């Protein structure tokens, strides 16, 4: 076999008969499989050892030669070669077909490749192949048409008319084979090119399709007649195994049944031909042979599938490849691995951020080889076998060895579903008792894990390189930021938030208020001995706290609380003292009002200060982000652990619980409800009198009850006690929100019926009072709908992620700078008055394209090609700049990927992105992962939607990425100019909008009900929407340029996500949208050798034009094509990637005809053939590096090998598409 890492590319072609014979080790002549008595393979059968190799290692069939010393000898008695039994997975056989047979993929696929080659309809082909009609192969001197079809009866009549031998007509695949041999590719191609110059309409479309197929045959060197099989390959027996079950029965692969049918029919046909049987019998047998081969290649493609026992359709070769259970997705793209385990997870509150708890019995099994090696190395036993016995006995000595082996050996933990890269992280194992894995509470958010019975899988990286990668790139303590938005993903939650909230509360008049302490220890001692309360405001000598004070502040007393002294204790030294929960204190330090000169009146100073709110979840998130910005990962993860411990400790001390008495009662609830009842009665009266319509009545009633609920909510908020545990949980962000609170204490309010419409009868009770039976029944509708929606949308969201990953998996950072001369002009994204994404957010972490100057002073804020940091972005916006030209993925010139400058910073690390980063996959995960939140959140918003026809949530995201025609489509103008008139036409129920511009006039028909976006006299740009709704991107592309469409799609995706409160970096959406507009359709080939109407990569198109322009010819013209992500995935240059995505047979059929070469540039193709992926440390520049310990000098000045210095060989994998199993020569 070929070394997989020496591959450069892989090609798939049609197999010629001679090729199939060269693969074969012998002909399979009999349908027998295994002898039922001896259980040995039958001679010349489907499992023959002579053809396929021995069933036992180094042993021939008759047993004359045993042992490895006879390797390579062919036994003179039984004819079996003495070799490894593994060859039974590699050696193929063949069947010599007694009549040619058509290959169903080429005759039945859409479009029918055979039909296009011969210019015959698939219907006519089918009649000929299945012996229902004759086709004229050579009319000779008769007036019959070449390739004309005639029935049996017509054929006889023509024979009588013109005489025997006056023309040649045949039926069956043999006839088609003769016709295919007659095809003169060069001549046909030339004729079609001529025809295209004049053809229009349907004729033109057909000519383009035929030209495409004929050109593919011509360029690839495949012969059209190879689509007809004269010889059928038999795949190796170990790929279609036959196993004995207990009870003497056999379980066999369906392929064996299908091969047996073919062999039986073939042998019967041979016998009939020997006997010179009547023509009709031979014909029938040939037709049956054709059907048997069809079933073997693709059962069920034509007619009824062949069924096995229990009328189950048999799985043919095509089914072995297709779908989730097919070869590609089941065995090649992901395999089950050894050194792995899974268990339930439990919380590990005492763990450090980089640790996880692994049960002892799991660890000993996972690390068995390492333990065994160490046992032998310590001379406890002499050999590995004895060491294994020692481990399996559970000897006392192994546990100490295990402790040492796992030290600094990271393991990977994974939770399904792995929606983004944080679904697999590395930890250092800590041995624990019990059987559950222990997980650090802070990484739960990244995994989306909780401890209600979730399970996780654990994997052990074995090699030194794998361990190094796990430790350096995947350690959980390093993953502070979320790759989708660059915000911290490990913020404290629940108890941790509550503890820190309680700790930083301030109260007036508690014991010890006004005391002054010389340092932290004295304050803590006073608190421990009960002299001062955590929340009491006290003074402390400023210079005793190790913080960045000014000289003036150092000699004063700081007014704070003991809780805040403890809270600031865990913060890094360089951070200001945190007294107020706001960003100003975090960045600039404590305000002056909290400092008291020595000897000042502390009681008076305290009484003049207002009470500060405590630190909530959001504040903690901001603190973590700031610390990450200043101190990076190591310090941040240490702080997070300290914050976690402090939070747990103080939420325990606070003893916050929830009792029924903690739910407050609203005194005037009855009056509020009475008032609403009266108003609803008035509304109903108005309706009965015919003053309002039913819809108006319904809207008024629901609005009234909504108002009642809000009124109660306001009362609750106004009267709430800040020390009420439920209020504290809600206010701190630990759990629950105001809506939960008002359902407990106010009223539940309006509910949705099963059809989604809001019911007019509200639930007046709250959970404290308890619901009546009817109210309880009403609430169940919403709960049930919530559950079903969640289940359905999870699947939708997962499928969206899969399509996104597929289309962008080969987008990798390939170079430092592509040197593009284009940039993207960006401004903030807004919808009406609502800001969707500010300019500051969009600028952060990108490179500028042009110099940015202050609009008033003209001073340079930032030069071209410079990285815009958070501070620079703020400076640009504060200067009043409204639009900036930046480097963007849209305008990047890098082939097969993006360059570092056009991408900007890697949001997951906050640093500039490195070459080799798989940004396509990251982008796909960042958009797909929040998909589940989208849909679920659309149902939480109550009320009647104002414009129901506009899609929202996940369906809208799918609509955008699949480039579908949107629901509620807006009418756009193709003319830039002024709206001169809007006329209403009552008869057709439409409006007409007239736009006049320099280039001409436009008249647009708009539905009567559409809401207008423009008014008479208003100016409109080309491609501007005249009505409310979504613009159809393909129509916009026809009117405007590619960049406008890309910008529009980017804005639309952001609108959906941001409206649901999900933040995603622009660059992720840019990567996906760019993949949708990578192709060009050739409109006029000029002097290039491109074909008209072909869809091709924009880079290849440019290259072809470059060559022609250099030679002084006329370049080709093309039109950019916007494709949905599914279509874009299938149109990728890699046939391996496309075939493993969807429509496997269609992709492979097409690839084989074209003789496609896969250059293995993406990730999927390399995973499929088992080669290291060309991203990250798998890029050529990191290969062949020996891992070793380095000294400091070497570490600071590394030497990196340049790309492209490895030897690679071109490997042509010539695949008979019939036997899709790869055979590499």
Curated annotation (Swiss-Prot):
The enzyme's E.C. designation: 2.7.7.6
Keyword tRNA-binding: no
Binding annotation for Mg(2+): 450, 452, 454
Source domain of life: Bacteria
Gene Ontology MF terms: DNA binding; DNA-directed RNA polymerase activity; magnesium ion binding; zinc ion binding
InterPro entries reported for this sequence: DNA-dir_RpoC_beta_prime, DNA-dir_RpoC_beta_prime_bact, RNA_pol_asu, RNA_pol_N, RNA_pol_Rpb1_1, RNA_pol_Rpb1_3, RNA_pol_Rpb1_3_sf, RNA_pol_Rpb1_4
Keyword Lipoprotein: no
Cofactor dependency: Mg(2+); Zn(2+)
Quaternary structure, from the entry: The RNAP catalytic core consists of 2 alpha, 1 beta, 1 beta' and 1 omega subunit. When a sigma factor is associated with the core the holoenzyme is formed, which can initiate transcription.
Family to which this protein belongs: Belongs to the RNA polymerase beta' chain family.
Name listed for the protein in its UniProt record: DNA-directed RNA polymerase subunit beta'
The species this protein was found in: Streptococcus pneumoniae serotype 19F (strain G54)
Taxonomic lineage from the root: Bacteria, Bacillati, Bacillota, Bacilli, Lactobacillales
């Amino acid at each position: 076999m070929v070394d997989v890492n020496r591959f450069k590319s892989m090609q798939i072609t049609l197999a010629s008969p001679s090729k199939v014979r060269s693969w074969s080790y012998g002909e399979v002549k009999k349908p027998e499989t295994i002898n039922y008595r001896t259980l040995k393979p039958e001679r010349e059968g489907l499992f023959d050892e002579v053809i396929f190799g021995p069933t036992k290692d180094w042993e021939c069939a008759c047993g004359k030669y045993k042992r490895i010393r006879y390797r390579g000898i062919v036994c003179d008695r039984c004819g079996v070669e003495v070799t490894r039994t593994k060859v039974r997975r590699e050696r193929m056989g063949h069947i010599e077909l007694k009549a040619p047979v058509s290959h169903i993929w080429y005759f039945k696929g859409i479009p029918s490749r055979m039909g296009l080659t011969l210019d015959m309809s698939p219907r006519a082909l089918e009649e000929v192949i299945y012996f229902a009609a004759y086709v004229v192969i050579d009319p000779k001197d008769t007036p019959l048409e070449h390739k004309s079809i005639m029935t049996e009866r017509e054929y006889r009549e023509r024979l009588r008319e013109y005489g025997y031998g006056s023309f040649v007509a045949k039926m069956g695949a043999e006839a088609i084979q003769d016709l295919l041999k007659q095809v003169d590719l060069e001549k046909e191609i030339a004729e079609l090119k001529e025809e295209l110059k004049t053809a229009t309409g349907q004729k033109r479309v057909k000519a383009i399709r035929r030209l495409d197929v004929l050109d593919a045959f011509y360029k690839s060197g495949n012969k059209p007649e190879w689509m007809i099989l004269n010889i059928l390959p038999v795949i190796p027996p170990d790929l279609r195994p036959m196993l004995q079950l207990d009870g003497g029965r056999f379980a066999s692969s369906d392929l064996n049944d299908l091969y047996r049918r073919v062999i039986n029919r073939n042998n019967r046909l041979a016998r009939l031909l020997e006997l010179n049987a009547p023509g009709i019998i031979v014909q029938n047998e040939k037709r049956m042979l054709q059907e048997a081969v069809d079933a073997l290649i693709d059962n069920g493609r034509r007619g009824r599938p062949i069924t096995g026992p229990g009328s189950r359709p048999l799985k043919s070769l095509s089914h072995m490849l297709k779908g989730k259970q097919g070869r590609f997705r089941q065995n090649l793209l992901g395999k089950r691995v050894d050194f792995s385990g899974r268990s339930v997870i439990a919380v590990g509150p005492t763990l450090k951020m980089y640790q996880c708890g692994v049960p002892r019995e799991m660890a000993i099994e996972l690390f068995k080889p390492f333990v065994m090696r160490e046992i032998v190395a310590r001379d406890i036993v002499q050999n590995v076998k004895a060491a294994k016995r020692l481990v399996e006995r559970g000897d006392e000595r192994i546990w100490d060895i295990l402790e040492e082996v796992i030290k600094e050996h990271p393991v990977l933990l994974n939770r399904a579903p792995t929606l983004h890269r944080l679904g697999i992280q590395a930890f250092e194992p800590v041995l624990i008792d019990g059987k559950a894995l222990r997980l650090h509470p802070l990484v739960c958010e990244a995994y989306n894990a909780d401890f209600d019975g979730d399970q996780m899988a654990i994997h052990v990286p074995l090699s030194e390189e794998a361990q190094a990668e796990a430790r350096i790139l995947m350690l959980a303590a390093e993953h502070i930021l979320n790759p989708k938005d660059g915000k911290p993903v490990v913020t404290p939650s629940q108890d941790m938030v509550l503890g820190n909230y309680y700790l930083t509360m301030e109260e007036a008049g508690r014991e010890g208020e006004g005391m002054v302490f010389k340092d932290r220890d004295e304050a803590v001692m006073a608190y421990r001995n009960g002299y001062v309360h955590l929340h009491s405001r006290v003074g402390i000598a400023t210079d005793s706290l190790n913080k960045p004070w000014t000289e003036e502040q150092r000699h004063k007393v700081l007014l704070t609380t003991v809780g805040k002294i403890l809270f600031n204790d865990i913060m890094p030294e360089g951070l200001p003292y945190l007294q107020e929960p706001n960003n100003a204190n975090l960045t600039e330090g404590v305000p002056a009002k909290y400092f008291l000169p020595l000897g000042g009146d502390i009681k008076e100073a305290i009484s003049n200060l207002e009470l500060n709110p405590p630190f909530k979840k959001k504040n903690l998130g901001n603190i973590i982000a700031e610390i990450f910005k200043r101190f990076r990962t190591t310090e941040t993860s240490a702080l997070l652990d300290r914050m976690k411990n402090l939070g747990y400790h103080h939420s325990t001390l606070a003893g916050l619980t929830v009792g029924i008495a903690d739910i407050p009662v609203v005194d005037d609830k009855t009056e509020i409800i009475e008032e609403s009842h009266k108003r609803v009665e008035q509304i109903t009266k108005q309706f009965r009198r015919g003053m309002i319509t039913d819809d108006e009545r319904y809207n008024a009633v629901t609005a009234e009850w909504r108002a009642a609920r809000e009124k109660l909510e306001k009362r609750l908020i106004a009267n709430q006690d800040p020390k009420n545990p439920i209020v504290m949980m809600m206010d701190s962000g630990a759990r629950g929100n105001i809506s939960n609170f008002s359902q407990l204490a106010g009223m539940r309010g309006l509910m949705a019926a099963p059809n989604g419409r809001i019911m007019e009868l509200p639930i007046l009770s709250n959970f404290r009072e308890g619901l009546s039976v009817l109210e309880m029944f009403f609430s169940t509708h919403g709960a049930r709908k919530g559950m079903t929606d969640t289940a359905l949308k999870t699947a939708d969201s997962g499928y969206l992620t899969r399509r996104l990953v597929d289309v962008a998996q080969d987008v990798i950072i390939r170079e430092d700078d592509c040197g593009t001369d284009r940039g993207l002009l960006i401004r903030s994204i807004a919808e009406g008055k609502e800001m969707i994404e500010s300019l500051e957010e969009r600028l952060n972490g990108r490179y500028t394209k042009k110099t940015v100057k202050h609009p008033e002073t003209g001073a340079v804020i930032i030069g071209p090609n410079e990285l815009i940091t958070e501070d620079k972005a703020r400076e640009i916006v504060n200067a009043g700049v409204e639009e900036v030209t930046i480097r963007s993925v849209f305008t990047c010139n890098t082939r097969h990927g993006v360059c570092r400058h056009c991408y900007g910073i890697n949001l997951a690390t906050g640093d500039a992105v490195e070459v080799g980063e798989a940004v396509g996959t990251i982008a796909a995960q960042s958009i797909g992962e929040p998909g589940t939140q989208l849909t679920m959140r659309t149902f939480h918003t109550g009320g009647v939607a104002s414009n129901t026809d506009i899609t929202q949530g996940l369906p809208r995201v799918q609509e955008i990425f699949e480039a579908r025609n949107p629901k509620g489509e807006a009418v756009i103008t193709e003319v830039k100019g002024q709206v001169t008139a809007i006329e209403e036409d009552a008869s057709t129920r439409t409006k007409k909008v007239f736009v006049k511009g320099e280039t001409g006039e436009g008249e647009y028909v708009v539905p009567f009900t559409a809401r207008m976006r423009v008014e008479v006299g208003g100016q409109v740009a080309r491609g501007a929407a005249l009505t409310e709704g979504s613009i159809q991107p393909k129509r916009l592309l026809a009117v405007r340029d590619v960049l406008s469409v890309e910008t529009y799609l980017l804005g639309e995706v952001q609108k959906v996500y941001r409206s649901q409160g999900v933040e995603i970096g622009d660059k992720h959406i840019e990567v996906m949208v760019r993949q949708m507009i990578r192709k060009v359709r050739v409109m006029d080939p000029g002097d290039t050798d491109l074909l008209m109407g072909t869809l091709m990569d924009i880079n290849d198109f440019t290259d072809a034009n470059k060559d022609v322009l250099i030679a002084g010819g006329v370049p080709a013209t093309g039109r950019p094509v916007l494709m949905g992500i599914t279509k874009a995935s299938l149109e990728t240059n890699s046939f391996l990637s496309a075939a493993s995505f969807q429509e496997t047979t269609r992709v492979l059929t097409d690839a084989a005809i074209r003789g496609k070469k896969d250059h293995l540039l993406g990730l999927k193709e390399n995973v499929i053939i088992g080669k290291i992926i060309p991203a990250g440390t798998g890029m050529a520049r990191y290969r062949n590096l020996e891992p070793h310990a380095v000294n400091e000098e070497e570490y600071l000045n590394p030497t990196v090998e340049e790309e492209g210095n490895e030897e690679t060989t071109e490997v042509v994998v010539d695949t008979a598409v019939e036997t899709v199993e790869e055979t590499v020569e």
